[in-house]
């Protein structure tokens, strides 16, 4: 309204001097309580641990109500909604040519991890590899060790059982790793200290039935971690679950013929 003062009031009130005063800009609608709670954790997942148990539980309930994309780029689970809510789904990996990737990996003294996809929903596994590498959102897969992106540490062969389309990456300096053993202990403490929040998480979780998939990802991210490692020791084929692609340096190279017994590439 303010920018149209001349046409709205020019025939009277404009001739005397300073012209019509600009109308005040309309006030933005007040945020709801749910919106305020969600705003606190966006980019700051640890904020939920500073809330009262009731506020944290209500935040979990609010997350469970959030919309997700329905074009196949996101998963219809609580973990996907949670990673969206804290801003983890939007980050991207460092993506390098294969030669630059190998130089960076050797300099960092890291081991390649392998992720495999299969054809699904009318799209090829290669399409999903590309989404992981450079898509504007991350698909949070289901799994026993937390919802996120699953990798086989140091074993292309172990990864191949999940699809013949394969990509690779290593954990960079932004990775913060926590083990499932640590999360189990953390979960027992959390459920005792935050019973309402824990109950809300149990109610909200979807994925692998009665597993701690939702609790693992929630606890890891809220305590400052973005990678979950199965068990306390890494051996070839150990499951690694990334919650945030910024923890990854990836090669642009992909393959379409992954199979059991293959060598690492």
Residue locations for each model-derived region?
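Intrinsically disordered, low-complexity segments
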Residues: 1-26
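Gram-negative host-targeted secretion-system effectors, predominantly Type III and Type IV
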Residues: 27-35
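Active-site and NAD+-binding cores of ADP-ribose-processing enzymes
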Residues: 34-150, 161-265
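Short, polar loop motifs at secondary-structure junctions
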Residues: 155-157
């Amino acid at each position: 309204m303010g920018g149209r003062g001349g046409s709205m009031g020019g025939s009277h009130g404009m001739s005397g001097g300073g012209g019509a005063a600009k109308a005040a800009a309309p006030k933005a609608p007040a945020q709801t309580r749910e919106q305020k709670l969600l705003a606190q954790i966006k980019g700051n997942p640890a904020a939920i641990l500073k809330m009262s148990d009731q506020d944290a539980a209500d935040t979990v309930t609010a997350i469970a109500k959030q919309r997700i994309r329905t074009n196949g780029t996101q998963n219809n689970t609580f973990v996907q909604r949670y990673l969206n809510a804290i801003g983890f789904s939007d980050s991207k990996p460092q993506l390098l040519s294969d030669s630059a990737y190998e130089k960076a990996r050797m300099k960092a003294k890291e081991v390649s991890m392998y992720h495999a996809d299969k054809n699904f929903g009318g799209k090829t596994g290669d399409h999903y590899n590309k989404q992981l590498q450079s898509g504007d959102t991350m698909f949070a897969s289901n799994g026993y060790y937390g919802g996120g992106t699953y990798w086989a540490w140091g074993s292309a062969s172990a990864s191949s059982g999940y699809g013949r389309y394969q990509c690779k990456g290593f954990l960079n300096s932004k990775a913060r790793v926590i083990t499932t053993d640590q999360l189990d202990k953390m979960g027992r403490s959390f459920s005792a200290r935050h019973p309402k929040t824990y109950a809300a998480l149990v109610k909200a979780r979807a994925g692998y039935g009665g597993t701690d998939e939702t609790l693992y990802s929630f606890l890891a991210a809220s305590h400052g971690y973005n990678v979950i490692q199965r068990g306390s020791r890494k051996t070839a084929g150990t499951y690694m679950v990334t919650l945030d692609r910024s923890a990854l340096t990836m090669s642009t190279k992909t393959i379409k013929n992954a199979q059991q017994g293959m060598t690492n590439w």
